[in-house]
Every structure is written in C-alpha cells, then in structure tokens.
C-alpha cells in the first residue's frame, strides 16, 4: 500500500514555497507521490488571474525531473465548466483511482478551521463535510496564529474523528510564506521576483507577458 498526497491550490503562479512545502510534507508523512491539483477557472470561491493552460504549463515546468511530484488535470479538465468543485468529489476521484493506497488531502490549518466552523451558518460550511471527514484522510499544515488542536476540539464533527488516523498534523517548520499574490504584484509593478519561483516559471511568465497589469488582491 502506498501513500499519496493531493495538494490543491490555484498555483497562480506556483512558487518555490509550494514546492518546498510539498517536499517537506512528503518527507514527514512518508508519501510516495504528491499530486499538484490546480483549480479550474470558473470556481465560485477563487478568481484566477491566468488561464488553466498557463498555470498547467508552469506547474509542469516546476516539477519536471522530480519523480515524487505529478500534476493532475482532474479539476481543470474532468470538472471543467462546473463551479461546484467540492473537495468531496476530488477525494472520491483519487480514492477510486488508487483504491489500494492511502490518499490524503493536503491543506492548511486555515482550511481545517473552515470545514465545520461553528460560527458560520450551516449552509456556508464545507459541502458534504460529514462524509468527507468520515471517509478520507488529511494532512494539515500549521499556520501562524492557528491552534489546530483547539479547532478540532471545538468542532463536534472533527472531534469525533480525532482518532490519530484521520488527521496528520504537521505543526513545525512550515511557516515560511511567499504568496502567489505577492509575486503577481511584483511582476505588475515591474519588480524582480526571480528568486521566489522556479527559473523556468519565471522565464515562462516573462516570455508570455503574464501578470503585467496592476492587480487588485
């Protein structure tokens, strides 16, 4: 049985921190493969600045030569045209694709807080959260100022599955932050973010004149 991580984000663009985070998580959680899952344009909860094709190409360039990493087109192709790209569907897809392996959804502690946030109306919490938590596993990355154990203890749903198997908490060494928004803004202002993302991606952005206009972030 292998161990697989699914790392979803807009990757607009992919940064060195995305790659470092994936590598660190793979090492600590002993993953055999990490799938980078770019979000599709058209999602109701995310506004992408570049096309699916550009973000796909940058990811392929970024991970080239690393057998641990792979890019998945599940959201940008198989669920293209739908705004309801819920995590439940994504995890069911990967679980069906790798039925003999353990599949983990990789997320930050901020998303853990959102799954069953008791301060939000029920209809604003994650869709299908009960069966998502009951049937899947998660690797949760620490975020500054967020107490992951407290989040779990405050949610009846999360607390019910706090069995040492559902949630793999990584609470140290992942606090470095370089946001894609910052890199986009640097490009828009004529800055030089060359060393914040892979060389091939930097050159791709320059060649294709991406992120050239002032952005509202």
Language-model regions, residue ranges each:
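Nucleotidyltransferase catalytic core that binds NTPs
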Residues: 1-217
